[in-house]
Amino acid sequence: MTATATEGAKPPFVSRSVLVTGGNRGIGLAIAQRLAADGHKVAVTHRGSGAPKGLFGVECDVTDSDAVDRAFTAVEEHQGPVEVLVSNAGLSADAFLMRMTEEKFEKVINANLTGAFRVAQRASRSMQRNKFGRMIFIGSVSGSWGIGNQANYAASKAGVIGMARSIARELSKANVTANVVAPGYIDTDMTRALDERIQQGALQFIPAKRVGTPAEVAGVVSFLASEDASYISGAVIPVDGGMGMGH
C-alpha cells in the first residue's frame, strides 16, 4: 500500500493545558520550559518557592490529597482542565538496607508513588470527561534494574511503571495515554554534589561516556505530549545514554 501525502503529513500542533508537578527546578523546570516553548499553557507546582518567570505556579504538596485538589482547581480556573499531566515531583532518601528505617522507606513511597497516584487520579476526572489526556510519569532507571542503597526509591519508581501501565489499559477507551520517561545519570544539582570518584565511576557504565542534560529528558516529554505520540501508551522510555540498553 502506498502512503499518501496526507498519511505521511505531520499532525497539526494543538496547544494544551499542561501541569508539571515539581516544575520549579531541575528536570521539572526544563520540562516546563520546553513545553511552554512548544506553545502549551504550562502550570507548575512548587513547595512555596514560587513559579519561574513565564509559568503559572501553584503551591502543592503531592503527599496531601487536599493540596492536590486545590492545585488542580487553581490550574483549571487559570487555563482550563489539565490535558497533559507530567508527574515529576518526588524525593530520595538513600540508605543501606540494614540502616533504612521504615519511616524513610514509606516517606519516599508516599511522595514518589502515592503522590503520582494522587495527581493522576485527580487529572483523570476531566481527561475521561473530555475524552483526551496525556499522562507522563518521570521515573528512573532505578525502577527497572535497581540501584544499591535505594530500595525505597527503586521500589517507588518500579511502582510508577506498573501504575502507568494499568492506567494505560484502563483509560485507553477515553483516549488517555500513560507513559514513563526513565532518566539515568542526569546533570542536576544533586548529581553535581556527588563525590568526583562517584561521578567518574558512574560514567564507566554509560556507553555515551557523559551525563545527560535535563533538556534531553524534556525533549522526550515534549514528544510524548505531542499529537505524534497519540499511539504510544504503556511505554517506558529510558534517557540514559545506553546505560540500561533499552531496559
From Swiss-Prot:
CDD domains in the cross-refs: BKR_SDR_c (cd05333)
Enzyme class at the top of the EC tree: oxidoreductase
Modified residues (N-acetylthreonine): 2
Site note Important for activity, residues: 140
Keywords, sorted A to Z: Acetylation, Cell wall, Fatty acid biosynthesis, Fatty acid metabolism, Lipid biosynthesis, Lipid metabolism, NADP, Oxidoreductase, Phosphoprotein, Secreted
Protein's UniProt keywords contain Acetylation: yes
Result of altering residue 191 to D: Phosphomimetic mutant that retains less than 10% of wild-type reductase activity. Impaired NADPH binding. Overproduction of the mutant leads to a significant inhibition of de novo biosynthesis of mycolic acids
Secreted found in the keyword field: yes
Active site: 153
Entry's Gene Ontology molecular function annotations: 3-oxoacyl-[acyl-carrier-protein] reductase (NADPH) activity; acetoacetyl-CoA reductase activity; NADPH binding
Note on domains (UniProt): Shows a significant rearrangement of the active site between a closed inactive conformation and an open and active form in presence of NADP. The C-terminus adopts a particular conformation that locks the conformational changes.
Self-association and partners: Homotetramer. Homodimer in solution.
Role according to the record: Part of the mycobacterial fatty acid elongation system FAS-II, which is involved in mycolic acid biosynthesis. Catalyzes the NADPH-dependent reduction of beta-ketoacyl derivatives, the second step of the FAS-II elongation cycle. May preferentially metabolize long-chain substrates (C8-C20). Can use CoA derivatives as substrates in vitro.
Similarity field: Belongs to the short-chain dehydrogenases/reductases (SDR) family.
Protein name as annotated: 3-oxoacyl-[acyl-carrier-protein] reductase MabA
Organism expressing this protein natively: Mycobacterium tuberculosis (strain ATCC 25618 / H37Rv)
